[in-house]
Amino acid sequence: MTRAFVGIQIPDQITALLQPVQDRLPMGRIVPPENLHLTLCFLGDVGDPALEAVHEGLSGLHPSAVDVTLSGLDWIGGAYPRAIVAGVVPNSGLSALHRAVLGACRAAGVTVERRRFVPHVTLARLGKARASAALNDVVLRHKLTPFGAFRAMGCTLYQSDLRPDGAVYTPLASYPLRSEGR
C-alpha cells in the first residue's frame, strides 16, 4: 500500500514569503519548504493497481492552468486546531481542477473523503498541543497578510511516507496543465 495524494507544489518565490512567518510560529512542527503544497485530493493508502489507475486517469485530464493566490493565516481542526495554514483564495479554475482530479480518482476506484474543498497550504502541524496565546497572536497578526500569487502549470501525484521527524513527499508523476490557447 502507498499513502498518496495529488497536489500543487508551491514555488520557491512563494515559500520564501512563507518562511519568515513559519519562523515566528512559537510551537508546532514546521512543514519544510520542499513539502509545501496545496492538496487537491488525498488518496490515503492505496494499492499499486489503484495507484496506476489514478495515474492513467490523471494523464487523460487536460484542465487549464490555474491562478493560486495565498492570503492570510488560519487554523484548521475546529475547536482543537491541528494545523496552521496559509489560506488560498478560492476561484473557479481551482475548483474545476479539484473536481476534475476528484473525478479521476473516483473513476479509478479510490474512495475519497466527501468534504468541502477549502484550499490551503499547511505551514505547521500542532499534533496534540493546545494553541498558545503567542501562537494565536501570530495567526491574528497575519490574518489578512498577502503571501503572493502564482500560475500553477501542473499538478503532481505524491507518495507520502510518514516518519517520526515528519512526512517525506516523493513525486511519482506530474501532469501539465493547459496554458491558454492550447
Task: Show the residue positions of the predicted features.
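Histidine-dependent nucleotide/RNA phosphoesterase domain, centered on the 2H-phosphoesterase fold
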Residues: 1-182
